Curated annotation (Swiss-Prot):
Keywords: Isoprene biosynthesis, Magnesium, Metal-binding, Thiamine biosynthesis, Thiamine pyrophosphate, Transferase
EC number: 2.2.1.7
Names of the cofactor(s): Mg(2+); thiamine diphosphate
GO cellular component terms listed in the entry, alphabetical order: cytosol
Family listed: Belongs to the transketolase family. DXPS subfamily.
Pathway terms, separated by semicolons: Metabolic intermediate biosynthesis; 1-deoxy-D-xylulose 5-phosphate biosynthesis; 1-deoxy-D-xylulose 5-phosphate from D-glyceraldehyde 3-phosphate and pyruvate: step 1/1
UniProt-recorded Gene Ontology molecular function terms: 1-deoxy-D-xylulose-5-phosphate synthase activity; magnesium ion binding; thiamine pyrophosphate binding
Record-given protein name: 1-deoxy-D-xylulose-5-phosphate synthase
Cofactor info, note text: Binds 1 Mg(2+) ion per subunit. Binds 1 thiamine pyrophosphate per subunit.
GO terms (BP aspect): 1-deoxy-D-xylulose 5-phosphate biosynthetic process; isopentenyl diphosphate biosynthetic process, methylerythritol 4-phosphate pathway; terpenoid biosynthetic process; thiamine biosynthetic process
Length: 620
């Protein structure tokens, strides 16, 4: 988006944070207004994450105004809220490329800018990373400051608490900013708390506090009494007792949209010693009425007209895998009250909105707590309930020990509905579901399935639900197949593949939705085409037939080649001393950047033409 200097006179002066610091403080409210307007107009023309960034405009301005970035370290959690940060740090004129192939990264990314001190995308990592940076600065004798910005959702995750517990122990000089935008911690915002925050963060109070500690250090009983009195006084006026118990000096809550208040408070806190936590209250979608009214709907948006009060409706199309999963859950719940559906804060994305409303007693959103989600399911299974864990592929990585130790080791019947498997598209490296087959395949007792289309997904979910062992059904973002979704549910034979087309010489073994892309190669080469369905157990009887009747075996998967489904076939063929040539097609040994699913598949040679070309090159 080209900057109209007449519309954005202040923003036009700022190409990096040093320029922002040249502005007089009384200009910051007007500057924040311009930044918010530019963000809205930019994202509405390009698509992307909107509501979170609208809510952090004043915070972003205040942080870059007070802190000497990039020398001072600023760490954003997750990164949805970092669009204003990107605009202020030299990337304003590239915002129209965000989340597009070869464009700006959707999240803070170290390779993109020196201002992005830590690459993010998953939640609750900021405090740990910032603590590491803070300790490093102290060891190097450098005076740089470290700030972690984390939301009220992300701070509930275990990793954030682990980091705060450690921070309180080592007492490193760093600041945590708790961006509370959902009224989930406190509603105590107003003139009194703003005034109290100024007092508690100011030098007068801090000097008295630290001086008293030194004076009373030789009189332990009196020191302990004074400390308790301070905690009780603060506890009557502020909701930060929990953080104080962890060893953090708590300030707030304050209005996160009062940029001058933020600047004053941050200036006070910048020079405080030890761990600090500033609690700010913000509104997701701030400044744009439709986003304020529907922050979830405006979290991630397509291109839209900001002058209208609604987002464009999606064009009718084939049902997505997430929709099919959600409908399947509702169908099963009508038949079985033992069904327990669990999600770690992915209700909308996993297609569970309808289920959560129709079956609230069987629905458990455990927040950003993947480890807990999996072990909760294990506990359900121990008592004869039927747990289904709906989780994104890239987030299941965070619960790997629980998958092994708490589920598979005990051979508990837990069904994992793994969404966003394979290439997900515009969210890039942190969200690609490239590794689940590789890290699950080595776990004993697991059954792993990959549907070729949405109808088959429904049958696989039903099959997994009936099994008496841990089962994973992994499916991609979006849809596959054009047929109407069947109302019936078919029990599939475990470990049995489906031969789609009988050919000669070349056999293409497809695991998942790339089956459709393999049709062209199968037709042109008169190859046998197999929908393998099961990654574990493999259909070894069929494999025996194929290696005795074909010269070339090709495996195809939307997963890392290393350790994936193709590797499983390789391992089996090696035990049989098979005299066939083997070609493995899948995701290469590198982190896949952002772009549409089709763009990235084509780039990796997993589109129709790419598969045909790769097989031709191999057999020739």
């Amino acid at each position: 988006m080209t900057l109209d200097s007449s519309k954005y006179p202040l923003l036009n002066l700022v190409n990096e944070p040093a320029h922002l610091r040249d502005l007089a403080q009384d200009k910051l409210p007007a500057f924040s207004h311009e930044l918010r307007d530019y963000l809205l107009n930019s994202v509405s023309q390009s698509s992307g994450h909107l509501a979170s960034g609208l809510g952090t405009v004043e915070l972003t301005v205040a942080l870059h105004y007070v802190y000497n970035t990039p020398d001072d370290r600023l760490v954003w959690d997750v990164g949805h809220q970092a669009y204003p940060h990107k605009i202020l740090t030299g990337r304003r004129d590239l915002m129209h490329t965000i989340r597009k192939k070869d464009g700006l990264h959707p999240f803070p990314f170290r390779e993109e800018s020196q201002y992005d001190t830590f690459s993010v995308g998953h939640s609750s990592t900021s405090i740990s990373a910032a603590l590491g940076m803070s300790i490093a600065a102290q060891k190097e004798g450098k005076g740089r400051k470290t700030v972690a910005v984390i939301g009220d959702g992300a701070i509930t995750a275990g990793m954030a608490f682990e980091a705060m517990n450690h921070l309180g122990d080592v007492k490193s000089d760093m600041l945590i900013i708790l961006n509370d935008n959902e009224m989930s911690i406190s509603e105590n915002v107003g003139a009194l708390t703003n005034h109290f925050a100024r007092i508690l963060s100011g030098s007068f109070y801090t000097n008295i506090r630290e001086g008293s500690k030194k004076l009373l250090s030789g009189v332990p009983p009196v020191k302990q009494l004074a400390s308790k009195m301070e905690e009780h006084i603060k506890g009557m006026m502020i909701p930060g007792t929990f953080f104080e118990e962890l060893g953090l000096n708590y300030i707030g809550p304050i209005d996160g949209h009062d940029v001058n208040m933020l600047v004053d408070t941050l200036r006070n806190m910048r020079n405080l010693k030890g761990p600090q936590l500033l609690h700010i209250k913000t509104q997701k979608g701030k400044g744009y009425k439709p986003a304020e009214a529907d922050p979830i709907g405006y979290h991630g948006v397509p291109k839209f007209d900001p002058n209208t009060s609604s987002l464009p409706k999606s064009k009718p199309g084939a049902a997505t895998f997430s929709n099919v999963f959600g409908d399947w859950l509702c169908d099963i719940a009508k038949q079985d009250s033992k069904l327990m559906a669990i999600t770690p804060a992915m209700r909308e994305g996993s297609g569970m909105v309808r289920f959560s409303k129709e079956h609230p007693d069987q629905y458990f959103d455990v927040a950003i707590a993947e480890q807990h989600a999996v072990t909760l399911a294990a506990g359900f299974a121990c008592e004869g309930l039927k747990p289904v864990v709906a989780i994104y592929s890239s987030f299941l990585q965070r619960a790997y020990d629980q998958l092994i130790h708490d589920v598979a080791l005990q051979n508990l019947p837990v069904l994992f509905a793994i969404d966003r498997a394979g290439i997900v598209g515009a969210d890039g490296e942190t969200h690609q579901g490239a590794y689940d087959l590789s890290f699950m395949r080595c776990i004993p007792n697991m059954v792993i399935m990959a549907p070729s289309d949405t109808n088959e997904c429904r049958h696989m979910l039903y099959t997994g639900y009936q099994a008496n062992c841990p089962v994973a059904v992994r499916y991609p973002r979006g849809s596959a197949g054009t047929a109407e979704i069947a109302t019936n549910m078919q029990l599939l034979e475990i470990g049995k593949a489906d031969v789609v087309k009988q050919g000669a010489k070349v056999a293409i073994l497809s695991f998942g939705t790339l089956l459709e892309n393999a049709q062209l190669a199968a037709d042109e080469l008169n190859a046998t085409l197999v929908n393998m369905r099961f990654i574990k157990p493999l259909d070894t009887a069929l494999l025996d037939e194929l290696i005795n009747s074909h010269d070339v075996i090709v495996t195809l998967e939307d997963n890392a080649i290393s350790g994936g489904a193709g590797s499983a076939v390789n391992e089996y063929l090696a035990t049989q001393k098979a005299q066939v040539s083997i070609l493995n097609l899948g995701i290469p040994d590198e982190f896949i950047k952002h772009g549409t699913q089709d763009e990235m598949h084509d780039e990796m040679g997993l589109g129709e033409q790419g598969i045909l070309t790769a097989i031709k090159a191999f057999i020739n």
